[in-house]
């Protein structure tokens, strides 16, 4: 029996996977509806071959210091960087980030939440976590190996010779999430393990009805009911996939809309494929009456409790940021 849209959204917000049967059916339904334009249908994500998954950890101690490691690789030996590295085949994201932190710093990490997802083209993803150190011993120069030379807690990373300054924004994001308790932040979000063989983008698109002020979401108009979902084009950046998909859903003159961030992340980790599914929250300022859907999708009114839950995730920092690297 297929799940109601309300139940699907509740599961996503609570960090639970949707049934694989529902996802498989809805994926194919959408591909039929929009023709899968712009997406090579023969593409299969294979970890470290046709898709690259990176994990990184921004760990901040009680003194506000950031955990850093010194590179051992010949191309950047002596430079400093966050604990980070490639996800290995058949490895899930949590195991990957724990492994990288242990190998490069000597410390044991208990990941608590995703704080940022980055994407460069549709087949390179970096997942940034934060968490707590629960054990281990900080790596010293005497323990240097091919993974790293040493690790240390750093108060000001700008005092270091960095491998790349691309981590500065990651560290700033981590500090905002961990140390600035005055700013409301999204709840903890962890990857959900589910077999997937494609790179997928699911949209939770909202708008309010002018006549009732009730929140609506866009859903399929036939069973099994589902949120819009499409394949991510591996050769273009993710915003291109989003833009093209929104045009398919609302026509070429799609009204101004705002992508807020990630509500959920489903990741296969080699179990039934090397795919993923990002659920992105998108909102229209214009009312439902002014943004009619095309094709086989309709606006669906949400009950008050669920509308409140979705609305609470619309402000800044209330979803996991998605950074598309151009």
What are these regions (language model features)?
Residues 2-56, 175-201:
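Acidic, metal-coordinating catalytic segment for phosphate/diphosphate chemistry
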Residues 87-110, 118-194, 230-326:
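Unchanged
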Residues 72, 202-223:
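Eukaryote-biased recognition of intrinsically disordered, low-complexity regulatory segments
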Residues 75-79, 223-226:
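A conserved beta-turn-beta hairpin within the catalytic core of GNAT-like acetyltransferases
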């Amino acid at each position: 029996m297929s799940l109601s849209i309300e139940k699907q959204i509740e599961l996503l917000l609570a960090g639970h996977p949707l049934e694989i049967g529902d996802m498989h059916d809805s994926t194919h339904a959408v591909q039929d509806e929009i023709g899968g334009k712009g997406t090579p249908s023969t593409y299969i994500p294979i970890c470290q071959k046709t898709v690259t998954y990176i994990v990184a950890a921004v760990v901040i101690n009680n003194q506000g210091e950031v955990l850093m490691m010194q590179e051992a690789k010949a191309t950047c030996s002596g430079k400093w960087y966050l604990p980070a590295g490639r996800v290995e085949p058949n490895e899930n994201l949590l195991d990957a980030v724990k492994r990288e932190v242990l190998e490069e710093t000597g410390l044991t990490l208990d990941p608590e939440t995703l704080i940022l997802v980055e994407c460069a083209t549709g087949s390179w993803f970096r997942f940034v976590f934060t968490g707590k150190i629960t054990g281990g011993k900080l790596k010293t120069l005497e323990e240097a190996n091919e993974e790293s030379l040493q690790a240390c807690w750093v108060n000001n990373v700008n005092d270091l010779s960095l491998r790349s300054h691309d981590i500065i924004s990651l560290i700033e994001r981590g500090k905002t999430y961990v140390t600035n308790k005055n700013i409301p932040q999204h709840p903890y979000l962890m990857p959900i393990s589910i077999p997937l063989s494609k790179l997928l983008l699911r949209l939770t698109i909202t708008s309010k009805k002018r006549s009732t002020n009730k929140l609506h979401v866009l859903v399929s108009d036939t069973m099994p009911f589902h949120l819009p979902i499409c394949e991510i084009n591996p050769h273009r950046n993710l915003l291109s996939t989003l833009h093209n998909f929104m045009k398919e859903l609302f026509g070429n003159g799609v009204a101004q809309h705002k992508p807020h961030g990630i509500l959920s992340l489903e990741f296969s980790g080699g179990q039934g494929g090397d795919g993923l599914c990002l659920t992105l929250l998108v909102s229209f300022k214009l009312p439902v009456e002014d943004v009619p859907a095309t094709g086989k999708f309709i606006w669906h009114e949400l009950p008050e409790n669920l509308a409140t839950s979705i609305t609470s995730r619309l402000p800044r920092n209330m979803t996991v940021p998605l950074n598309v690297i151009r």
